[in-house]
Curated annotation (Swiss-Prot):
GO cellular component labels: membrane; nucleus; plasma membrane
Chief location category: membrane
UniProt gene name: AMIGO2
LRR repeat residue intervals: 69-90, 94-115, 118-139, 142-163, 166-187, 193-214
Protein name (Swiss-Prot/TrEMBL): Amphoterin-induced protein 2
Summary of subunit composition and partner proteins: Binds itself as well as AMIGO1 and AMIGO3.
């Protein structure tokens, strides 16, 4: 495929013109280095522009001659066993999706993904991973989706997902985890953008009830726990009931998959549904748990009174309410506070909202009888309705003015096109004037007065015009007494004849401009 350099001048000199040598030289150099730069499609793969699929080809490593600018690489159903710093021989700067499911991957080393820094989706599902060690994904700064389901993972290092600041979805279903990965939400390596965590069908017997309240409400909504062998407990029951009442899809969609083991004695147990009425009489028992939820977003106007209700599911009986403002100020019932008031039923009133009052307010509902409390985060936005209304009014006026101008223009155009600009009387006078002018032309161009001709003659010769011009004798020698017209008069006569004659006037035109003597009769 490549060409030797010393043969290039000979080819260029023999075939190509001097003006095209540089262009052909550039093209031939491109052909020479092309395969090394762009890569080819390996025989074990299927390539489609920026997508390469090498599935079920018994591969143990990534082919080295792949196109480096691919965006999606599928290596599933192969026998790749170890991910180290050299398992990908080249750098894929634009690769955003890497699929490695159904391989024999047993471990991942630090630096395994240094050649794929821009991955957004990594699929390592259905492999043989047992542990995820510290910071093995730290190079993947923009990773958004990580799939690790259907492995043998029994331990997650607290720093295993350190550096994944953009991670939004993490799938850990179908593994051997025995503890809920609380480090994903609290601590040094927490993932602030994680909105979906699937730890279903693991081996988790209980939940850390005293720490689950630290998880923000927006992240709680995306935790899936179904299919785990929970031990029946009123705290867990209350947590799931709270999520169910708040219509969390993680509980609503998998209601019948939440079960627990109820021990009748030390040897025998049975599986029962967690989300059922009168479960273990938990509605009246002491729970000693804390829960957190994300409340509504309220819009307030500057200076207009706003009331916000505490959307707690603990019930109002034996429940006390307090609010915590954005500045961590405590707002309690029966206490005079500037611009704020809290009722005993948990409602918060802001008498005259200001811009600085906007933020997240936390309502804490505490049930003393059951030692149960819930925190509901409510967002309050404050805006100036007068300013926004004036801007909207100005926009409406501008739009209305533009529309009115367009309609007026269309009406004027229609009037100009379809309405007669001159009245009928004016039109009659104009037709009479045109008739007089036509008679005048006829009198000039006809051999005699128009009144002398009979009606039949006028009718027969209505479409013809004859021009009688005074012939001038040319005194120059050689003309034999012939007469001719001046060039300027010939042009004038020709213009008159062309504008007034029909197809039948060709004979009279020829007679006028012939070389035969023209004799005017008296």
């Amino acid at each position: 495929m490549s060409l030797r350099v010393h043969t290039l001048p000979t080819l260029l000199g023999a075939v190509v013109r001097p003006g095209c040598r540089e262009l052909l030289c550039l093209l031939m150099i491109t052909v020479t280095v092309g395969p090394g730069a762009s890569g080819v499609c390996p025989t074990a793969c299927i390539c489609a522009t920026d997508i390469v699929s090498c599935t079920n080809k018994n591969l143990s490593k990534v082919p080295g001659n792949l196109f480096r600018l691919i965006k999606r690489l599928d290596l599933s159903y192969n026998r790749i066993g170890l991910l180290d710093s050299e398992w990908i021989p080249v750098s894929f700067a634009k690769l955003n999706t890497l699929i490695l499911r159904h391989n024999n991957i047993t471990s991942i080393s630090t630096g395994s993904f240094s050649t794929t820094p821009n991955l957004k989706c990594l699929d390592l599902s259905s492999n043989k991973l047992k542990t995820v060690k510290n910071a093995v994904f730290q190079e993947l700064k923009v990773l958004e989706v990580l799939l690790l389901y259907n492995n043998h993972i029994s331990y997650l290092d607290p720093s295993a997902f350190g550096g994944l600041s953009q991670l939004q979805k993490l799938y850990l279903s179908g593994n051997f985890l025995t503890q809920f990965p609380m480090d994903l939400y609290v601590g040094r390596f927490k993932l602030a953008e994680l909105m979906f965590l699937d730890v279903s069908y693991n081996r988790i017997p209980s939940m850390p009830m005293h720490h689950i309240n630290l998880v923000p409400g927006k992240q709680l909504r995306g935790i899936y726990l179904h299919g785990n062998p929970f031990v029946c407990d009123c705290s867990l029951y209350s947590l799931l009931v709270f999520w169910y009442r708040r219509h969390f899809s993680s509980v609503m969609d998998f209601k019948n998959d939440y079960t627990c083991r109820l021990w009748s004695d030390s040897r025998h147990s049975r599986q029962v549904l967690l989300l059922q009425d009168s479960f273990m009489n938990c509605s009246d028992s002491i729970i000693n748990g804390s829960f957190r939820a994300l409340g509504f977003i309220h819009e307030a106007q500057v200076g207009e009174r706003l009331m916000v209700h505490c959307d707690s599911k603990t019930g109002n009986a034996n429940t006390d309410f307090i609010w915590v403002g954005p500045d961590n100020r405590l707002l309690e019932p029966d206490k005079e506070m500037e611009n704020f008031y809290v009722f005993h039923n948990g409602s918060l009133v802001i008498e005259s909202p200001r811009f600085e009052d906007a933020g997240v307010y936390s309502c804490i509902a505490m049930n003393k009888q059951r030692l149960l409390n819930e925190t509901v985060d409510v967002t309050i936005n404050v805006s100036n309705f007068t300013v926004s209304r004036s801007h909207a009014h100005e926009a409406f006026n501008t739009a209305f003015t533009t529309l009115a101008a367009c309609v007026a223009s269309i009406v004027l155009v229609l009037l100009y096109l379809y309405l007669t600009p001159c009245p009928c009387k004016c039109k009659t006078k104009r037709q009479k004037n045109m008739l007089h002018q036509s008679n005048a032309h006829s009198s000039i161009l006809s051999p005699g007065p128009a009144s002398d001709a009979s009606a039949d003659e006028r009718k027969a010769g209505a479409g013809k015009r004859v021009v009688f011009l005074e012939p001038l004798k040319d005194t120059a020698a050689g003309q034999n007494g012939k007469v001719r017209l001046f060039p300027s008069e010939a042009v004038i006569a020709e213009g008159i004849l062309k504008s007034t004659r029909g197809k039948s006037d060709s004979d009279s035109v020829n007679s006028v401009f012939s070389d035969t003597p023209f004799v005017a009769s008296t």
